[in-house]
A protein has these predicted regions:
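Mature, structured domains of secreted/extracytosolic soluble proteins
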Residues: 6, 24-187
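Bacterial N-terminal signal peptides
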Residues: 10-21
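Bacterial N-terminal signal peptides that target proteins for export
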Residues: 1-12
């Protein structure tokens, strides 16, 4: 009986070890996959940079076109880290009619660059870092102010406009994106 119990114990131990070794890689893979966030119907992979991810979001085609027109692809593909408040296509659609078409013209590159770099803060700031009343200095040089209300995060621009963070903490290899529902305007 003792010999049979020993064999049974050894078999159970082997089964546990084998099942653990098979499950561990799957769990690690699932954990890496769970770090991805869906934005605009596309997975945003933490192993890719801001530009590599943004080009796949159907909600950010206007932003991507503007980044290309402003010549900021190289910068936002760089090492960073950056915190980007990324306006959706709907956010750009809230601007007066014709604004985006005017901004992407070569003669307006400086203005477009000013607006886009106003959405970028040096360093990686997670949602938990965006505390109520916190002032952020953008790459453009002006300030943004964080407001929290009802569990939501709002970013207030220099003109008093408020943009709500709709998808926080979209991690990138060179920073983090927070999707916002309005375009932020510098002073």
């Amino acid at each position: 009986m003792s010999k049979g119990l020993g064999i049974l114990s050894a078999a159970v131990l082997c089964a546990v070890m084998v099942s653990t070794s098979l499950v561990a890689p799957v769990s690690a893979k699932m954990m890496r996959h769970s770090d991805t966030v869906m934005v605009g119907g596309a997975a945003m992979y933490p192993s890719k940079n801001i530009v590599q991810n943004a080009v796949h979001s159907k909600d950010h085609t206007t932003l991507v076109a503007a980044v290309k027109a402003a010549g900021l692809v190289g910068t936002l593909s760089g090492p960073g880290p950056f915190t980007v408040f990324a306006p959706t296509n709907e956010a750009f659609n809230k601007l007066p009619k014709g604004t985006v078409a005017t901004l992407v013209k070569p003669e307006n590159k400086a203005t477009l660059t000013k607006i886009l770099t106003y959405h970028v803060v040096p360093g990686k700031l997670e949602a938990s870092d965006l505390t109520d009343g916190k002032t952020l200095t953008t790459v453009e040089g002006d300030q943004l102010t964080v407001r929290r209300s009802g569990g939501r995060i709002y970013i207030v621009d220099a003109k008093g406009g408020m943009s709500r963070v709709t998808i926080p903490n979209v991690n990138q290899s060179n920073g983090v994106i927070h999707v916002v529902n309005s375009v932020l305007m510098p002073g």
